[in-house]
């Protein structure tokens, strides 16, 4: 996510879309301004939405919250629409993705042990 792509989907961009558009986001939660998405759903400009990400997801998406009341009113409102599905960061969870994650992790461990450059090293 960059400053240029943050809230790429917003009130203005939604107003330029065809009526009844379907919005899918499996990238980054902050690509979509959630309140603008909700307004688009309410006024039927947006026909449906499929979201694997949410801009405030860290509080809700990484552990079981089924025994807890959602205190994020924006997320609760979003979940109230029958034409919205939120999959809580599950789109990545495929056999191929898990194999790639495991292979990358093992390669990084091997490279670290052998004092080779790490392809996925995050530097401060």
Listing of model-derived features with the role each one plays in the protein:
Residues 3-23:
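Rossmann-fold NAD(P) dinucleotide-binding segment
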Residues 20, 30-124:
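Rossmann-like dinucleotide-binding domain for NAD(H)/NADP(H)
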Residues 1, 29:
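Short donor-sugar binding/catalytic loops of nucleotide-sugar-dependent glycosyltransferases
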């Amino acid at each position: 996510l960059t400053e240029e792509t943050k809230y790429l989907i917003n009130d203005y961009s939604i107003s330029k879309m065809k009526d009844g558009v379907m919005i899918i986001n499996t990238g980054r939660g902050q690509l979509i301004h959630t309140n603008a998405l909700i307004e688009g759903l309410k006024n039927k400009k947006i026909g449906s939405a499929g979201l694997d990400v949410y801009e405030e997801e860290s509080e809700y998406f990484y552990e079981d919250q089924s025994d807890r009341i959602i205190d994020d009113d924006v997320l609760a409102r979003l979940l109230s629409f029958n034409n919205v599905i939120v999959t809580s960061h599950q789109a990545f969870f495929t056999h191929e993705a898990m194999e790639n994650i495991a292979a990358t992790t093992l390669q990084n461990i091997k490279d670290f042990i052998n004092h080779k450059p790490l392809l996925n090293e995050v530097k401060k």
